[in-house]
């Protein structure tokens, strides 16, 4: 009897899944075009799954092993079940392989069931709570019905009643895991996730065959000359089709929710919920069906679902509140933690672009900052002719005078800030101590455009960027060095797309911590370690998660003889200071302030100082008032730490200095 029922069940489930797949693909194709290399993408799926996806999953060893057993067992068991029971080819080892695959899957499902007994708050509930039962039903059912195929049990064991029961168990598993995979069930992520890996919007994120780490973090430029292209995203169809596919790949594990600084601060942003809102906006349904945790203080509702209907509005009457979008600091912690490699920040900035460019709805001081950038080329509205007033006593060489230098020192967006001027003075002292041939643009330098772009004003960003590019192209230099990770990021990763056709950004861009470390390692900047201090280092988001630089600042601190103690959240899991993405400008209230939480992390280390490498981090962390009875922890830029150490370093002899400088020049410029 099972010989008749099992092929019917298996091929019926596959047929219904195929119908659901076509329906789902049609929904994704409502999005804007996005060319992808189809065959190359499909061929890359195994490597992207086994290397890149599991690189994230493996951070939790237990869940990594569980996922390998459950997912690997299911794929193998389903494929073998089609051959053994669907096609009736049970000869040889195929039946035994199916037993092994289903047993492996069952073992993995036991761990899934254990995790679902007391799930952490970040895990979605609803249909996901029945997933362990479905996994166990399918794996156990397939295991038992395969025993007669390999001769362990007689073909008619148990009679027709047992056969019907086993067929019902297998049907339950097939309905949830195969049919439900393309009809919005908990296994939807398996179908959408595989295609998402193949047709990812950022294929450069994936590691290459040589083992190199992939990284693609620059925002995509809007084509402002295309009159038919939407200025940002108002409705699901305004996303590219593979962005919609990516949202559908969400496994609702809540890792993004757990690391989001805005969510932790009680602001109305939950990145997991936001991704599910994109799905709900496309296909409809109740938010509660898709997500376990709503936004802080936001009701859970229903949406009819329409790819061409608005999902964001300035007054918060649509599915996504404007306040949700403006709460994001663009720290990229959610993207870094996502095992499905979904691009939350891209989606948020896309919707911000609509609010800013189409509706002029930038909250807080956003409109004032953008007006200042347009009128004065700086966010504070200061006289652009006064960019170097603070450095009148430093006699800084100007590129307009020298036309050529080893290093172009990019002063950055905080050049008018008195606190940041102290950092710049320290960096200039370090460069001169290392005998670096550098020059500055002076009044020719404009704001990098970072804050305009993060606030959604792509037009102002592109205007600033193109004028800066025109200025840079007039001079000769070996590299750009800056102490601002935000300027560093846009210069390195976002300006390249705006260069005129036929021109390239043919210069490296260094964060000052990396450049200082190069100088130390090459012997160009000899340091005598001073008195050891207990310090902790705060990783700037735009240096660490955006650009993968974690080691150089720590190497500099070790060279200074510092006792470095790490915060619990450091490196790629560093907590944001709250200063990125224009968040201090839009100023969406929450239950607590993000920088207060970060300084709480600092106090737990009992460090004497917290070392930073970003002017925004400095401003945010220094603005924290310590709790009663606690002394304020000093906040120092890494350039200030090195400059202070220079006061304790005896000068090198002229001969040895010249030799070291010559060798270092060759190394830095090679």
From Swiss-Prot:
Cofactor: [4Fe-4S] cluster
Transmembrane helix is among the record's keywords: yes
EC number: 1.-.-.-
Disulfide pairings: none
Subcellular location as annotated: Cell inner membrane
UniProt GO MF annotations: 4 iron, 4 sulfur cluster binding; metal ion binding; oxidoreductase activity
Keywords, comma-separated and alphabetical: 4Fe-4S, Cell inner membrane, Cell membrane, Iron, Iron-sulfur, Membrane, Metal-binding, Oxidoreductase, Repeat, Transmembrane, Transmembrane helix
SUPFAM superfamilies in alphabetical order: alpha-helical ferredoxin
Chain residues that bind [4Fe-4S] cluster 1: 250, 253, 256, 338
Membrane topology: Multi-pass membrane protein
Root EC class: oxidoreductase
One cellular-component annotation, GO: plasma membrane
Loss of function: phenotype: Deletion mutant loses its ability to grow using DMG as the sole nitrogen source but is still capable of utilizing sarcosine and glycine as the sole nitrogen source.
Cofactor note: Binds 2 [4Fe-4S] cluster per subunit.
Transmembrane domains' residue ranges: 2-22, 68-90, 94-113, 135-155, 159-179
Protein name: Probable membrane-anchored ferredoxin csal_0991
């Amino acid at each position: 009897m099972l010989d008749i029922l099992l092929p019917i069940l298996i091929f019926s489930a596959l047929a219904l899944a195929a119908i659901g797949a076509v329906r789902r693909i049609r929904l994704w194709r409502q999005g804007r075009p996005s060319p992808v290399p189809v065959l190359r993408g499909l061929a890359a799926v195994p490597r992207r799954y086994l290397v890149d996806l599991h690189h994230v999953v493996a951070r939790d060893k237990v869940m990594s092993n569980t996922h390998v057993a459950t997912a690997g067992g299911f794929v193998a068991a389903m494929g073998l079940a089609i051959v053994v029971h669907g096609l009736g080819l049970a000869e040889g080892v195929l039946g035994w392989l199916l037993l092994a695959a289903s047993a492996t899957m069952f073992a993995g499902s036991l761990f899934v069931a254990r995790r679902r007994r007391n799930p952490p708050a970040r895990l979605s509930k609803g249909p996901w709570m029945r997933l362990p039962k479905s996994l166990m039903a399918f794996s156990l059912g397939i295991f038992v019905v395969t025993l007669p195929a390999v001769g362990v049990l007689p073909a008619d064991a148990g009679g027709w009643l047992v056969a019907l029961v086993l067929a019902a168990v297998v049907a339950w598993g097939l309905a949830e895991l195969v049919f439900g995979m393309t009809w919005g069930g908990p296994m939807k992520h398996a179908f959408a996730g595989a295609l998402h890996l193949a047709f990812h919007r950022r294929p450069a994120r994936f590691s290459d065959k040589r083992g190199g780490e992939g990284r693609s973090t620059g925002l995509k430029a809007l084509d402002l000359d295309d009159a038919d292209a939407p200025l940002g995203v108002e409705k699901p169809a305004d996303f590219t089709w593979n962005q919609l596919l990516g949202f559908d790949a969400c496994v609702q594990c809540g890792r993004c929710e757990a690391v989001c600084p805005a969510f932790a601060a009680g602001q109305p942003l939950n990145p997991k919920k936001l991704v599910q809102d994109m799905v709900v906006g496309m296909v409809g349904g109740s938010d509660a069906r898709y997500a376990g945790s709503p936004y802080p203080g936001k009701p859970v509702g229903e949406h009819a679902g329409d790819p061409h209907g608005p999902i964001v509005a300035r007054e918060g009457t649509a599915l996504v509140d404007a306040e949700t979008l403006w709460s994001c600091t663009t720290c990229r912690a959610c993207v870094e933690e996502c095992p499905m490699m979904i691009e939350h920040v891209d989606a948020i900035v896309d919707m911000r672009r609509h609010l800013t460019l189409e509706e002029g709805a930038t909250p807080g001081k956003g409109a004032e900052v953008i007006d200042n950038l347009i009128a004065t080329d700086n966010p504070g509205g200061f006289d652009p002719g006064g960019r170097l007033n603070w450095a009148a006593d430093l006699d800084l060489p100007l590129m307009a005078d020298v036309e050529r230098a080893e290093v172009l020192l990019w002063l950055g967006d905080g050049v008018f800030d008195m606190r940041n001027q102290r950092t710049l003075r320290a960096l200039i002292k370090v460069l001169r101590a290392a005998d670096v041939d550098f020059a500055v643009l002076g009044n020719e330098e404009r704001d990098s455009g970072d804050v305009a772009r993060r606030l959604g004003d792509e037009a102002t960003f592109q205007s600033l960027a193109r004028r800066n590019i025109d200025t840079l192209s007039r001079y000769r230099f070996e590299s750009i060095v800056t102490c601002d990770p935000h300027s560093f990021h846009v210069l390195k990763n976002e300006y390249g797309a705006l260069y005129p056709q036929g021109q390239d950004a043919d210069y490296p861009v260094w964060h000052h911590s990396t450049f200082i470390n190069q100088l130390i390692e090459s012997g160009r900047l000899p340091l005598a370690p001073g008195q050891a201090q207990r310090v902790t280092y705060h990783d700037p988001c735009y240096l660490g998660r955006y650009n993968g630089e974690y080691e150089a600042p720590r190497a500099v601190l070790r060279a200074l003889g510092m006792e470095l103690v790490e915060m619990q959240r450091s490196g790629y899991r560093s907590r944001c200071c709250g200063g990125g993405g224009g968040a201090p400008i839009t100023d969406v209230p929450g239950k607590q302030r993000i920088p207060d939480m970060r300084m709480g992390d600092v106090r737990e280390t009992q460090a004497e100082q917290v070392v930073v490498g970003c002017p925004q981090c400095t401003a945010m962390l220094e603005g924290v008032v310590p709790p009663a009875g606690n002394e304020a922890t000093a906040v120092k830029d890494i350039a200030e730490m090195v400059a202070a150490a220079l006061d304790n370093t005896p000068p090198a002899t002229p001969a040895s200095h010249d030799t070291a400088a010559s060798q270092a020049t060759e190394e830095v410029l090679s």
